[in-house]
Design a protein with these regions (language model features):
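GST-like domain detector, emphasizing the conserved glutathione-binding G-site
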Residues: 1-135, 240
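A local structural micro-motif
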Residues: 29-31, 160, 218-219
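Positions that flank functional sites
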Residues: 35-36, 163, 225-226
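GST-like fold's C-terminal all-alpha helical module
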Residues: 103-208
Length: 240
């Protein structure tokens, strides 16, 4: 029985799950939901996930949501290839680095992304990118990116010698940040991070390495291909 995955274009959390499914070469049915139409909050979706967020994975009668929970489930149910390590020690390091990313990078990264993409009436016409908080967020991201850069200067992947859950967690966030910093209004802010290939060469090589994985194109946000900047409604959901 095929796995059903419900996701939205541009959601870094849904992207994690798609990367895992492709890496494990698991057959799945893709259900792309439109954030602009609030399809993720429709009655059928709320029946699967009362929080109305993506990703949601349905495997037979079993329903799983929250992206890390989905990755963990997939690795237990379909263990080859492992994405949480093949030993307790490897798994411990992978989980530790994921926790570090979620505690020390992701909140700052998402603050920046939302400030750039936010088109709400309350902030339209303002310049939130010059706020002290956003500057501090960018400083924090740049500092932590150097930690990831140091890891990747010693290994092809963030932890160990194989693609793992930690790569799946971090990669979509970095790609979303890059997309946000390409916006003209983010030019001054972006100099602290962009171009990635110059400021963080090992990180840049890692991004290219992930992009070359089999099945990667099927995980790429479809609306990004049109080169249209996403709105807050498309990218602004909280972690799932």
């Amino acid at each position: 029985m095929a796995i059903d995955v419900y996701w939205g274009s541009g959601s870094p959390y849904a992207w994690r799950v798609l990367l895992a499914l492709e890496y494990k070469r698991l057959p799945y049915r893709s259900h792309l939901l439109q954030f602009s139409k609030q399809e993720h909050k429709s009655p059928p979706m709320l029946a699967l996930n009362p929080r109305g967020r993506v990703p949601v994975l349905k495997d037979g009668d079993y329903v799983c949501f929250e992206s890390l929970a989905v990755l963990y489930y997939l690795d237990l149910k379909y263990p080859k290839p492992h994405i949480f390590g093949s030993t307790p020690e490897e798994g411990g390091v992978i989980m530790r680095v994921i926790c570090e990313y979620q505690a020390y990078i992701e909140p700052h990264l998402m603050n920046i992304v939302r400030a750039i993409f936010d088109k709400s009436p309350q902030t339209r016409g303002a310049n939130p990118l010059r706020a002290d908080q956003i500057t501090a967020d960018m400083h924090a991201v740049a500092s932590e990116a150097r930690t990831i850069e140091a890891r990747l200067s010693k290994s092809d992947w963030v932890v160990g010698e194989t693609f793992s859950a930690v790569d799946m967690v971090i990669f979509p966030g970095i790609q979303l940040l890059r997309r946000a910093l390409e916006r003209p209004e983010a030019r001054e802010l972006s100099s602290r991070f962009m171009p990635v290939e110059v400021n963080y060469p090992a990180l840049g090589r890692w991004l290219a390495r992930v992009e070359s994985l089999p099945g990667y194109d099927r995980t790429y946000p479809p609306h990004w291909r049109a080169a249209a900047a996403p709105s807050a409604a498309e990218t602004g959901q909280k972690p799932a």
